[in-house]
Curated annotation (Swiss-Prot):
Similarity section: Belongs to the acetyltransferase family. MshD subfamily.
Subunit structure comment from the entry: Monomer.
Taxonomic path: Bacteria, Bacillati, Actinomycetota, Actinomycetes, Geodermatophilales
Enzyme class, broadest EC rank: transferase
Gene3D superfamilies: 3.40.630.30
NCBIfam families linked to this entry: mycothiol_MshD
Protein's name in the database: Mycothiol acetyltransferase
Length: 308
């Protein structure tokens, strides 16, 4: 019988601790075929996050890292959120249970939501055993790029022009439009200048794949694409419809379709064979639209919630 894991949490990991967690994430990705943490959680692991966040570590008696969780305390009385991963060689040894127990202690009297990426059987079993219920479901959808026109003829409203993002110039306009486009979205609509800055500093950031639709000096919408390197979302590089948003006042002008075409054409010209996107399962209108555009369901992320 293995000894119970040792669990501790810190405000911020040192570089050696971050490196150890990143190695664990790579091992879990290779074993499960899905990244165990969201991009946001990985950024906060590496760069820190808002007040109330904690890095939670589980280790064996010999000090080996067996599990990790990222806890976000949130603000006010809202739900606390977390994501966790257990090392492939340490599963079904109480590590997930120990991490979850500490996350619940950190949440205190507030409800806790825990994201499970890939909706793997082990994560569902752990959540249900501890009284959690499915609260949100995020679909990953994919399509082939072979049928995409690499040089599409765009139908844009009169006076509207599409150009690529200019770092150091377009940030504030994009943040304002993004907040309006995603006013009802719990994560995307709350992006700050720091959130954008961190992504501009990432190795994958490429302004040549970040398209903005302007009417004079007014930003109407954007399509930000991303390229995942081999091993990130599969054995080959994969494109992503990273952020596609239209200002509510510009809805109905056909900009969503035009910007989608521009972004997919860009990814096709890069030689990529597949593109992915994420959409809420209960957003049936968007899911239907994407299915009509050739996307099919590929993977599922689940937010499990337990009321206190």
């Amino acid at each position: 019988m293995s000894a119970a894991p040792l669990v501790r949490d810190v405000d911020r990991l040192d570089p050696a601790g971050v490196a150890a967690v990143l190695a664990l994430l790579r091992a879990a990705t290779a074993a499960d075929g899905v990244r165990p943490l969201s991009e946001e959680a990985e950024l906060r692991l590496q760069h820190g996050g808002p007040a109330g966040g904690r890095d939670v570590l589980a280790t064996a008696a010999d000090g080996a890292l067996t599990g990790y969780a990222r806890f976000e305390g949130g603000e006010g009385t809202g739900d606390a959120e977390a994501e966790l991963v257990v090392a492939p060689g340490s599963r079904r040894r109480g590590v997930g249970r120990a991490l979850l127990t500490r996350l619940e202690e950190l949440a205190g009297d507030r409800p806790l939501r825990v994201w499970a990426h890939g909706d793997l059987p082990g994560s569902a079993e752990l959540a249900q055993r501890h009284g959690y219920e499915r609260a949100r479901v995020l679909l990953q959808m994919r399509r082939e790029l072979a049928g995409v026109d690499p040089e599409p003829r765009l139908r844009l409203p009169e006076g509207v022009q599409v150009r690529t993002f200019r770092s150091g110039t377009d940030e504030q306009a994009w943040l304002r439009t993004n907040a309006r486009a995603f006013a009802s979205h719990p994560e995307q609509g709350s992006w700050t200048a720091e959130d954008l800055r961190l992504r501009e500093a990432e190795p994958w950031f490429d302004p040549a794949g970040f398209f903005l639709a302007w009417d004079g000096d007014r930003l109407l919408g954007s399509h930000w694409t991303k390229v995942h390197p081999p091993g990130d979302e599969g054995p080959e590089a994969v494109g992503e419809v990273y952020v596609l948003g239209i200002d509510p006042d510009a809805q109905g002008l056909g900009l969503g379709r035009a910007l989608t075409d521009v972004g997919l054409a860009h990814l096709r010209r890069l030689g990529l064979r597949q593109v992915l996107l994420y959409v809420e399962e209960d957003n049936t209108a968007a899911v239907t639209l994407y299915e009509r555009s050739g996307f099919t369901r590929h993977a599922v992320d689940v937010s499990w919630r337990r009321a206190r």
